[in-house]
C-alpha cells in the first residue's frame, strides 16, 4: 500500500483554485476551516436557515446555496449525507461541472453504486479522513493530522492524484499519512464494518448481553454497567494499542474468559452470517434496499429507529448517566 506524507503533496496546486464544501456538518466544518487555515480559498454551500448555516457564519464564512458554491469552485467536495447526495448533485452541482473541475467525496457510496455518474471530462476523487470532524479539526490545530484514505475514480486532467493529494494536505491528512484505496474497497469495507462490527454487531451484542442478565434476574442497572458502560474502557484500550494492549491491561480472569468464551459467541454460524452480509454489500443488495427505503418515505427505517429507542437499556442508561458528573461537562 502506498502512503503519502507532506513531502509528497504540493499545496501550491490549489493556490489559484476555489474549493466548495457542500454541507457544513461534521466533516464539512473541519474540511473548510483546515483548508482555509492552509491558505486555500473556500466557499460554503449550505441549506439556508439551519444551524449549520449559522455555524458557518460564526466560523467566519459567508455561506451560499450549493448551486452558487458549485458554480464558483474548481474543486467541489460533497459532504451532505449519503441519502441526499444524488439530489444535491443533480440539482445543484451537475449544471456547474465544467470540464477540468474536480468532484470530491469523503465516502464512496454514491459513486460506487452509480447513484452519481459524473461526466467523463471531470476528475473524481475521494479524500476520507479516518476520524470524526471535530477530531480532524482539533488535531490540525495542534499541528498534526488525522490519516486519510485517497482514491481516484476518474482522471480526466491527468493530474487527479496530485490535486487530491493537495486537498488532503490542506485538511491535514498528509501530516498523519494518506493511504491509497479504491472507491469499491472503501465503500464495501466501510459498510461491512458498520453493519457487522461497529454499529450493528456491537449494538446487538450489547443488547443481547443486557437482556441475558436481566432475564436471569440480575438488576438492570448492574447489567447496564457490565454490558454497555464498561465497553468504552475496553474499546479505548484496543484503539490505543490493539487487541494485545487490551489483553495486557485486563485481569488474567478476564483474559482467560476472553479466550474460552469469545469463540462461543462468535461461532461458525456468526461468521457465515458475516460473509452473507458482505456478499449483500458487494452485490448491491444492501444499497438497493437503502435507496428504495429512502425513496419510499423511510417508514421501515423510522419504525426500527423508534423500536430501538424504546429498548429498556435506553431508560436504564439515561438514569445512570445522570449520575455521572463527567458526562455533564
UniProtKB/Swiss-Prot annotation:
Mg(2+) 2 binds at residues 190, 226, 230. Binds 2 magnesium ions per subunit. Pfam families: KARI_C, KARI_N. It comes from the Bacteria. Residues 1-181 form the KARI N-terminal Rossmann domain. The keyword Magnesium applies. Transmembrane segments: none annotated. GO terms for molecular function: ketol-acid reductoisomerase activity; magnesium ion binding; NADP binding. Keywords: Amino-acid biosynthesis, Branched-chain amino acid biosynthesis, Magnesium, Metal-binding, NADP, Oxidoreductase. Its cofactor is Mg(2+). Its EC number is 1.1.1.86. Mg(2+) 1 binds at residues 190, 194. Residues 182-327 form the KARI C-terminal knotted domain. GO terms for biological process: isoleucine biosynthetic process; L-valine biosynthetic process. NADP(+) binds at residues 24-27, 47, 82-85, 133. HAMAP family: IlvC (MF_00435). Belongs to the ketol-acid reductoisomerase family. Involved in the biosynthesis of branched-chain amino acids (BCAA). Catalyzes an alkyl-migration followed by a ketol-acid reduction of (S)-2-acetolactate (S2AL) to yield (R)-2,3-dihydroxy-isovalerate. In the isomerase reaction, S2AL is rearranged via a Mg-dependent methyl migration to produce 3-hydroxy-3-methyl-2-ketobutyrate (HMKB). In the reductase reaction, this 2-ketoacid undergoes a metal-dependent reduction by NADPH to yield (R)-2,3-dihydroxy-isovalerate. This is Ketol-acid reductoisomerase (NADP(+)). The lineage of its organism: Bacteria, Pseudomonadati, Thermodesulfobacteriota, Desulfovibrionia, Desulfovibrionales.
